[in-house]
């Protein structure tokens, strides 16, 4: 299996950037398009477990658009072959001492790259160094 083929990695990096822009600017239509429209799609959030695209879309529609700006760090995108990828990142929001973590599983579907599973969590600021425990 080919890992991080340059063209595939560039595609996933671009769609990840599109997702991030849509998230912080609350472009719900773009977010909806980037999630696989299936009952099998899962998004585990900080305070919610969303099973299926209907639950994910309802959450996005009801969420406040305030306070969405964030700064990303330690983003790792890995592609596996032509049609599967993971995107992991840490994030911080102004005024919140906690570190957010986001994991996404992307699959190339007929409609293009879409998230089929996602997880978001917050942790207290880690005491270890940023490089400790990270893959090279």
For the regions a language model picked out, list residue spans one by one.
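Surface-exposed, charged secondary-structure patches
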Residues: 4, 8-11, 43-46, 54-99
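Structural motif
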Residues: 37, 80-81, 109
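Flexible, glycine-rich phosphate/dinucleotide-binding loops
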Residues: 41, 50, 122-124
